[in-house]
Amino acid sequence: MSAIWGIVDLSAAQSEAQRKNRAGNLWEEALRMRQAYRTSCLDRIQEKREATYYLACGVQDVTREAVEERFPYERKGERRSLFVADVILDNRRELVQRFGSRWDLCSHPDGEILYESFCSHPEETLAVARGAYACAYLEPGKRTLTLFNDAVGNRSVYYFQEEKRVYFSTLLAGITCERENWKENTGWFDRFYTIRDLRAVSEPRETPYAGILRLAPGEIVVFTEEGVHRRDYWDPFAGRKILRGKTEVGYRELVTTVFRHCVEDVIREGRGGKETGILLSGGLDSNAVAAYAAPYLAARGKKLYSFTAVPEEKERARIPGQYAVEDERSSVELVRRFHGNLEPEYLVTNRGDLLAENRRLREVLEVPCKAVLNLPWMYESYR
């Protein structure tokens, strides 16, 4: 995935000296924010700066279309707007058919499709768009900045406002770099330690830093000179209904059809013909996904590359009945018998000091985490 960051000054007109001073400060802050992304695995940075704003996107070319992204996208004229997004869409064609002004958008990158859709039909786009995305939409003439993300929060963005200036960033470091001392959000830490399960937070908008917030799943936040307006644009229970009158076979067909579409829609051709991978265990969750993904790829002459964590030999040699790390090789090999295009890779990770691993991975996650058991091998797989 990519990353977005920026600074927007929403203050009204001032004296020429004040405007120059604020513009100079904004540029200094923009340079610090950009520096926070110097170690990120980005293919390129696309950015634009004027006196009252700085918008940037660090693009990763993870799909074939991503190579053509040209952030920030911009419409000129009376309704001038600019747009940056960290986005991978699952229903590109549907958005183009419904809201696109040009059919040739089907071959264009995800960011451009989402921008064109949102410009012409903002509310409908929020209701229809599927995928993983976090976006910033700026209307300079109105001095309005809109942040929004996908309905289930696959992606998010942090934000902070001070003196009518809004800072947003995919990485926390993009905001925390702007000052040396931040107050702790003691409520966040209190809840982190008192929740007696693997949930790290109970309030999705809060962060360990006082004043820095993040988009909740399915949220749109609008910043104007007058204030901040937040709302949830998606409710999973709104409009639900009971499907009656179907046979057992009919219900089964409905479920499998929806599941198949969900799996197939997220499979995208990578840049340079890169292949598709999956984190695969011996359980039903990941195997259900593999059961649809493998045949879909096989029909196109492609393989499905799986990654599975397995214990070291000393872990496997423990006495039966005692605590041990499960070795799921046999389960994966059984699945491989059914899907000839499955290419498994087994990752042996040292689980001896998970606390040390957690400290190392906290630099990646940027916030404390509880569920440390799976993080080392997942991190190695993603690398």
Regions found by a protein language model. Name each.
Residues E328, L354, N374, M378:
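Conserved donor sugar-nucleotide recognition element shared by glycan-biosynthetic enzymes
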Residues L365-A371:
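Long, Lys/Arg- and hydrophobic-enriched amphipathic alpha-helices
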Residues M1-N350, R359-V364:
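Cysteine-centered catalytic environments shared across enzyme families
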Residues A151, L354-R359, Y379-R383:
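Active-site adenylate/phosphate-handling loop in enzymes that bind or generate adenylated species
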